[in-house]
Amino acid sequence: MENKFEIGRIIRAKNISDAWYRGLNIIWNHGRVITDERGSQIKEFMDLMVVIENPYTDRIPADTAWNEERLEEYAKQLISGENIQDFEYTYGQRLRNWNGEVDQIEYVIEKLKESPTSRRATAVTWIPPVDTKVNEVPCMILDDFKIRDEKVHLTTLFRSHDFGGAYPANLYGLSKLLEYVAEKVGVEPGVITTVSISAHVYDHDWDMVENIVKGIN
């Protein structure tokens, strides 16, 4: 029997591993199967918010296919804006050289130094003149940094979020990015919150996810 359609849940997680396992559990047990515009079957839960209290410990879930070397490379590309593996684009390029014009991470750092309570330390990856005309578009859309209680916190919006394959790498990279920004600004890194409009797992990951969920329930 198909799950009743449901939108919106909040997870308060201790660390990245805890966030991943609990997110997979919600998607698997409360998501619905759809066929996406590319013809792939996914199991999807809409509007999943995950608040990670300490994203600096237990960053690599035991069951992920990502290892530390690959994760470090991913984080380096995110922070530096380099395209080490010759992708069509990287998040780092969009953050560091948006539309060939703006280093948004440098802007965020300077904005927070200038005005620690600013609500304008926001970086986006979507470029409408480009992304409305191509096949490969960013899943991570927005990164917002705020200093509160003497720490800089990060909220990230994903329009589409591959929880099975990409979430561990995304969060590892974001935790490193937040540490980088915090060091440059001169404050401690804080909480990371992700908002995933479409949190999903692809059909090729269903067996893996089912086994993981069985193991944690």
UniProtKB/Swiss-Prot annotation:
Cite the EC number. 2.1.1.-
Q: Which organism is it from?
A: Methanosarcina mazei (strain ATCC BAA-159 / DSM 3647 / Goe1 / Go1 / JCM 11833 / OCM 88) (Methanosarcina frisia)
Quote the Pfam families the UniProt record gives.
Thymidylat_synt (PF00303)
Q: Which GO terms describe its molecular function?
A: thymidylate synthase activity
Protein name, UniProt field: Putative thymidylate synthase
For this protein's source organism, the top of the classification is: Archaea, Methanobacteriati, Methanobacteriota, Stenosarchaea group, Methanomicrobia
Q: Which UniProt keywords apply?
A: Cytoplasm, Methyltransferase, Nucleotide biosynthesis, Transferase
What the record says about family reads:
Belongs to the thymidylate synthase family. Archaeal-type ThyA subfamily.
This protein's major location comes to cytoplasm
Q: Where is the active site?
A: 139
Record keyword Isomerase present: no
What job does this protein perform?
Answer: May catalyze the biosynthesis of dTMP using an unknown cosubstrate.
Q: List the disulfide bonds.
A: none
* Assembly, per entry: Monomer.
Record-linked Gene3D superfamilies: Thymidylate synthase/dCMP hydroxymethylase domain
Q: Which EC class heads this enzyme's classification?
A: transferase
Instruction: Report the InterPro entries cross-referenced here.
Output: Thymidate_synth/dCMP_Mease, Thymidate_synth/dCMP_Mease_dom, Thymidate_synth/dCMP_Mease_sf, Thymidylate_synthase_arc
Q: Where in the cell is it found?
A: Cytoplasm
Q: Which GO terms describe its biological process?
A: dTMP biosynthetic process; dTTP biosynthetic process; methylation
List cellular component terms (GO): cytosol
| Metabolic or biological pathway, per its Swiss-Prot or TrEMBL entry | Pyrimidine metabolism; dTTP biosynthesis
